[in-house]
């Protein structure tokens, strides 16, 4: 997939249009998020990883999603405010998006194809599914929502060496 990954058009939660091209050459952790989920405290761990590795070429891209139990009901502005006030999130958040089904964000379709889940399933099962992408744009690994950000630290460190 590599180069194609960078062609995806995206909308930041501010409404600004962008592509993944601006993240070319960086290690990425792409996550579908939610504000009212049992895994929401993972924002704290994600922010810790971001602060630890951002200056070394690491980015976290957060994509709020309301497809799982309607646990992300707010507007993009509400979501950004919640994340900043409660968890100090400073990594980029994008417009609320779908990750499964006919209206799924094409980026997530590509991620799921490159890194299927358990038993080859491509569907994202819940909030805080994480995809690790190397600096060349290759999707290396998919992490289940139950995997805490701190458990991914060594994988990120290895890619940044």
Label the model's feature ranges.
Residues 1-161:
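Chalcogenol-based redox active-site neighborhoods
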């Amino acid at each position: 997939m590599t180069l194609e990954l960078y062609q995806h058009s995206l909308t930041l939660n501010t409404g600004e249009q962008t592509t993944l091209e601006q993240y070319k050459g960086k290690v990425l952790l792409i996550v579908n998020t939610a504000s009212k989920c049992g895994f929401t405290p993972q924002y704290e761990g994600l922010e810790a990883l971001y602060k630890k590795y951002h200056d070394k070429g690491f980015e976290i891209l957060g994509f709020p999603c309301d497809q799982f139990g309607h646990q992300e009901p707010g507007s993009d502005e509400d979501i950004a405010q919640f994340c900043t006030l409660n968890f100090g999130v400073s990594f980029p958040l994008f417009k609320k998006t779908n990750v499964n089904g006919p209206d799924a964000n094409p980026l997530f379709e590509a991620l799921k194809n490159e890194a299927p889940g358990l038993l080859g399933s491509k569907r994202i099962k819940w909030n805080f599914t994480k995809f690790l992408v190397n600096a060349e744009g290759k999707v290396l690994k998919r992490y289940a929502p139950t995997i805490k950000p701190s458990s991914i630290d060594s994988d990120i460190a290895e890619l940044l060496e």
